[in-house]
């Protein structure tokens, strides 16, 4: 069973009633000036700080496997609870992290179903290519998750967003 996942922009997350979620994954740019932080009350929040890039650029922070692993561990802790995953635009990084969580929950052999669920959650998904490749490796999907994702939707191969 997959967790209830919602993907949004940073602005939408700022305006949302976050208390309705069991967990919030905040993915922020390395140069964010006003980060979104939860107060001490539920839900729990995981903050990941990296930029929407696929190769090294100046002082920007590249996505790394540890970001995916931390998100997967956080989602495991939430279990079948509800998750809000947001990044600045709600398109690339949050979609890729959402896909990693869905694919892990569904298990091997369910890669196409994982991508289809992501499409239903966020029809505007353009997952970060680097994150999808790393997820495929972490979950030992032998490029199947990456291929299914790239066949069904566009992947961002951004220089910087």
Language model features with spans:
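Amphipathic alpha-helical interface surfaces
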Residues: 67-71, 93, 97-98, 114, ...
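Short catalytic/ligand-binding loop motif for oxyanion handling, primarily in non-cytosolic enzymes
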Residues: 33-34, 56, 92-96
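Glycine-rich, flexible N-terminal cofactor/catalytic loop recognition
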Residues: 1-42
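Catalytic cysteine-centered active loop of the rhodanese-like fold, especially the PTP/DSP P-loop
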Residues: 75-105
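PTP/DSP superfamily signal
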Residues: 78-80, 103-161
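Helix-loop module immediately N-terminal to the HCX5R catalytic loop
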Residues: 46-84
């Amino acid at each position: 069973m997959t967790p209830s996942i919602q993907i949004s922009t940073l602005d939408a997350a700022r305006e949302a009633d976050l208390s309705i979620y069991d967990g919030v994954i905040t993915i922020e740019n390395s140069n964010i000036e006003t980060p979104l932080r939860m107060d001490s009350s539920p839900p729990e929040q995981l903050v990941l700080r990296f930029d929407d890039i696929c190769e090294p650029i100046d002082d920007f922070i590249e996505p790394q496997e540890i970001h995916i692993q931390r998100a997967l561990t956080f989602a495991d802790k939430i279990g079948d609870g509800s998750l809000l995953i947001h990044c600045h635009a709600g398109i690339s990084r949050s979609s890729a992290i959402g896909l990693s969580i869905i694919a892990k929950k569904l298990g091997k052999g369910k890669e196409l179903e994982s991508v289809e669920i992501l499409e239903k959650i966020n029809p505007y998904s353009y997952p970060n290519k680097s994150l999808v490749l790393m997820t495929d490796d972490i979950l030992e999907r032998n490029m199947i998750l990456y291929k299914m994702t790239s066949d069904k939707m566009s992947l961002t191969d951004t220089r910087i967003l």
